[in-house]
């Protein structure tokens, strides 16, 4: 690797594990993702943090949750779902193709909806929606009482925020972690 390259990643593994897992989408021209792919057991990486604040607030575990993610933005929700299996939650995961879905079998079809925007729209054991998460939200209004957590690219976050607000979800019930 050589030089210091900074990137922000969200922890994928739950706190109960004795190892740290992150999801990294390999970008063809990407410096860091390409180098991470070449890492071998025993290679040294410098990690700083955590710096985010995504968590289930005390006293809210009995409420209904809506997790909305695109791509590797599913990371915090995977961690939250494994750490809090009792949550009444639904996860919308927006991807271009089924190969980009991560561990969907952990959630069950009643709690997981894959929103696939590309032309390949088949995946076994998954509830599929043909289109983006934003289109799904427009067609399936969200109850204003849901706690909504969003993670992914900024365009999706801002658009989902506006849709959730139009459904009557107050800003105090919308939490976001923006990737880029």
Question: Where are the regions a protein language model picked out?
Answer:
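FNR/FR-type flavoprotein reductase catalytic core
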Residues: 31-180
């Amino acid at each position: 690797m050589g030089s210091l390259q900074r990137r922000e990643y969200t922890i994928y593994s739950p706190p109960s594990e004795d190892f740290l897992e992150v999801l990294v989408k390999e970008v063809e021209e990407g410096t860091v993702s390409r180098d991470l792919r070449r890492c071998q057991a025993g290679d040294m990486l410098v990690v700083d943090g955590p710096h985010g604040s995504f968590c289930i607030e005390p006293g809210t575990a009995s409420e209904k949750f809506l997790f909305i993610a695109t791509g590797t933005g599913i990371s915090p929700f995977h961690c939250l779902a494994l750490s809090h299996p009792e949550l009444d939650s639904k996860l919308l995961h927006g991807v271009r193709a089924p190969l980009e879905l991560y561990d969907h079998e952990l959630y069950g079809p009643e709690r997981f909806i894959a929103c696939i925007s590309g032309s390949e729209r088949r995946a076994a054991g998954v509830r599929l929606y043909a289109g983006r998460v934003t289109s799904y939200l427009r067609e399936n209004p969200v109850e204003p009482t849901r706690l909504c957590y969003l993670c992914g690219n900024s365009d999706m976050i801002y658009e989902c925020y506006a849709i959730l607000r139009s459904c009557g979800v107050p800003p105090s019930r919308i939490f976001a972690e923006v990737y880029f």
